[in-house]
Amino acid sequence: MKISKLIITLLSFLLILTGCASGGKDKPQKDNWNDFENQKTIVIGFDNTFVPMGFQDKSGKNIGFDIDLANEVFKKYNIKVQWQAINWDLKETELKNGNIDLIWNGYSKTSEREKTVLFSDEYLINEQVIVTKKSKNIVNKDQLKDKVLGAQTGSSGYDSFNSNPEILKSIVKNNDATQYESFNEALIDLENDRIDALLIDRVYANYYLKQQNKLQDYNIINAGFEGDSFAVGARKADTTLVKKVNEALKELYKEGKFQEVSNKWFGEDVATDYIK
């Protein structure tokens, strides 16, 4: 009898522990908007090294285009954003487990991701562009025939360059691009005329040239590859949250605040037609 009571007591204790362990981590698959409104806070997961979308400055402060934009969105609802740096490879898992409430940091909307994630409207298209000095008089990609092109090793731009050779690879000198470990190195060579043009993400090109106050000295040409559509990712059940994000983005554009944030980071209006 004593043994039976002991077993029952132990089983009850284990059940309590199991409940405590799982209750705080996994958010139920429900529409959580009322909880966000009541708690006045929301957790957004981001990669804190993705310049210029969301990253940390030298003091450790979170800054970037997406940081500013998200803060403005939730300011409209009197909700404070808690920024949570995450392992970007595990972003969907963090969202599903309830460790974060949104993914917002240059997050590309794809058909594969749409199977498990509810996306907001696309607010920015990150294109692959060709950057050239205006003094080179190159205003379209056809003028890159036999010119020296640079690209970052392993970048999405260089991948597109190789997988779509008819667009650019067949035109440039040696039918290949000079490869660099970083965009900064490539941009230095571009500035010093060691290469004629550079294949690069538009968001990074605009940010870098804006920071250097050199936008006016360069031509930025669409490379002709398919761009990445950036959107905000939520759990499938959080339909009200996504609706509120979409509404706020449109309101921010009408008020001119979206353009203000865009010009701060890129020197131009990057909004998609979904937002305008």
Model-derived features: where do they sit?
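A ligand-binding cleft/hinge motif common to bilobed small-molecule-binding domains
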Residues: 90, 107-115, 160-163, 188-192, ...
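Periplasmic-binding protein-like
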Residues: 48, 125-132, 202, 210-247, ...
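Extended ligand-binding regions for polar small-molecule ligands
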Residues: 21, 67-76, 142-148, 153-155, ...
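Ligand-binding cleft/hinge of the Venus flytrap
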Residues: 56, 70-79, 157-179, 209-214
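Acidic, polar ligand-binding/catalytic clefts
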Residues: 71, 80-143
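Extracytoplasmic small-molecule ligand-binding "clamshell" domains
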Residues: 26-106
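Short helix-initiation/N-cap motifs at beta->coil->alpha
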Residues: 82-93, 176-188, 228
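C-terminal motif of bacterial Sec signal peptides marking the signal peptidase cleavage site
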Residues: 17-19
